[in-house]
Each structure stands twice: as C-alpha cells, then as structure tokens.
C-alpha cells in the first residue's frame, strides 16, 4: 500500500519524470516557484481527496462484494470495469440517456486528462532531442510518436490478445505481461528512484545554498524562513532515507516476491 501510494503521489505530481525540471527551465528567474509549487501540490491533493470521497463510496454502494485488490493494484479496472458498471446501474434511477450522458462526460474528462498528461510527459524527451541532439521539434515529435505508438500497441496486445505480450516474462514467481513490466519498472520502481537521485543531487552536488538562492530570487521571504530550513534538513536526511527504503522494498516485492519491511 505504501509503495503504491508513493508511486501514485509521484505520478500525480509529475515528480521523478523530469517534467518539472523541463518546464522549470522555461520559467523566468523572478517567478515565485515556492508559491507555484505550493498551489499545485495543494490543488492536486485536494482534487484527489475529493475524487476519492466521491468515487469509492459509490463503488462499494453499487458493488459491496468488490475485490479491494482491484482498487489498489491498478487503476485500469477502476476506470474501465468498476465505474462503467456504476454508470449502467444508474439507468435504473436516472434513465438510459441520463446514465449515458454522465458516462460520456466522465470519459471525455478522462480523455482530456490523458492528453494533457501526454503533452507534459512527451515534452521531456522532445526537449532533450532538441537541445542535445540538435533535432527539430517536428522530427523529434515524429520519432517519439513512432516509438510511443509501438509501445502503446504492444501494451494493448498484452491484455490477452497475443500470448507473446500477455506472457512476456516471469519474475517473482508470476507470469507478467508487457504492460505489467512497464508498470512495475517505470511506475512503481523508477519514479521513487529518480526522486531519491534528485534529493542526493540537490543535497550533495548542487548544494543547498544554490537551491536557496534560486528560490529566493522569486520569493524574498524564502531565505531564512522555516520552509528553507525544513527543505535543507529534509532533503538531506529523512526524505532520501524513506525513498531508499521504499525503493529497496519495492524492488524486493515486485521482482523477488519478498518484503524487506514486512508489509
């Protein structure tokens, strides 16, 4: 549960993927990063909390026998199995057209959320190809579209369509599909590892005084504040320690079926 919660937090806030670093490079030196970061974190957490209060009670109300593992292990069954069943059940109370109208609006919102997330995610490799490889944005987008499209097709085929992708490999005593490998490696494992590496880089390579200087350029009250002291302490102490423990436990659980922390 802790591993999944951490991975979800990293993904929801776009942490550990280079997105914020890439977008941050486009900001003006005088922009208030402290205020902007606080607003994003508070808004994202609030929306996620409210969504949980709305969705989870509805799921258990319409389907009291639901397997809780389906809710915690993957969001795929939540979006494409459990919620559609709720929309079908709503036909008994608000009618066919009302239920389908709600379902249509919901999946449109999911579509736009996916598109906006894709834009931010794809900007990272696009910026790398443009800045480091001197490739035009058009060529970079075409290259990434072909690569990403191939991975998407392989992931889609791993849901029981082709055995080679459905039974892609085996580890931790279980057969894993290509989609499972993508989730286990890049979602559950790499995101916390990247967060750990950023903490170590800021604390021991870039140094805290440079971080303070950059943030203070857009916020005159940051230097010497309790937030500055907290960040300087946490980034070099308990945050990387927690991330390291969770990363090691995630690797042990996902790939060796063994829990280092006992949960």
Language-model region placement:
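Transmembrane helix-loop junctions in multi-pass membrane proteins
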Residues: 1, 26-32, 54-67, 90-101, ...
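Alpha-helical transmembrane segments
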Residues: 121-135, 178, 200-228
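Juxtamembrane inter-helical linkers in multi-pass membrane proteins
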Residues: 1, 70-85, 170, 210-226
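A generic transmembrane alpha-helix motif of multi-pass inner-membrane proteins
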Residues: 171-202, 223-263
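Transmembrane alpha-helical segments in integral membrane proteins
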Residues: 14-29, 109-127, 194-212, 247, ...
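Loop-to-transmembrane helix boundary motifs in multi-pass membrane proteins
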Residues: 43-49, 98-103, 112-115, 128-166, ...
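Hydrophobic alpha-helical segments of multi-pass membrane transport proteins
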Residues: 111-118, 141-155, 159, 176, ...
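Membrane-embedded translocation segments of transport machinery
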Residues: 1-115, 119, 139-140
């Amino acid at each position: 549960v802790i591993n999944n919660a951490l991975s979800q937090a990293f993904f929801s806030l776009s942490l550990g993927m280079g997105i914020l670093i890439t977008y941050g490079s486009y900001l003006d030196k005088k922009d208030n990063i402290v205020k902007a970061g606080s607003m994003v974190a508070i808004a994202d957490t609030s929306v996620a909390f409210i969504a949980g209060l709305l969705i989870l009670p509805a799921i258990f109300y319409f389907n009291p026998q639901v397997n809780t593992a389906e809710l915690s292990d993957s969001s795929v069954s939540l979006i494409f199995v459990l919620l559609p069943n709720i929309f079908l059940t709503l036909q008994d109370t608000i009618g066919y057209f009302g239920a389908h109208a709600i379902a249509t609006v919901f999946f449109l919102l999911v579509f736009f959320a996916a598109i906006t997330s894709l834009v931010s995610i794809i900007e990272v490799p696009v910026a790398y190809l443009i800045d480091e490889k001197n490739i035009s944005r058009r060529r970079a987008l075409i290259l990434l579209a072909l690569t990403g499209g191939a991975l998407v097709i392989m992931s889609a085929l791993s849901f029981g369509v082709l055995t080679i992708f459905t039974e892609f490999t085996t580890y931790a005593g279980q057969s894993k599909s290509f989609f499972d490998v993508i989730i286990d490696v890049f979602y559950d494992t790499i995101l916390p590892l990247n967060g750990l590496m950023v903490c170590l880089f800021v604390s021991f390579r870039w140094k805290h005084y440079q971080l303070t200087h950059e943030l203070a350029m857009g916020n005159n009250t940051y230097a010497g504040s309790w937030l500055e002291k907290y960040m300087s302490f946490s980034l070099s102490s308990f945050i990387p320690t927690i991330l390291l423990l969770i990363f090691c436990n995630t690797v042990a659980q996902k790939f060796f079926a063994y829990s280092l922390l006992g949960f």
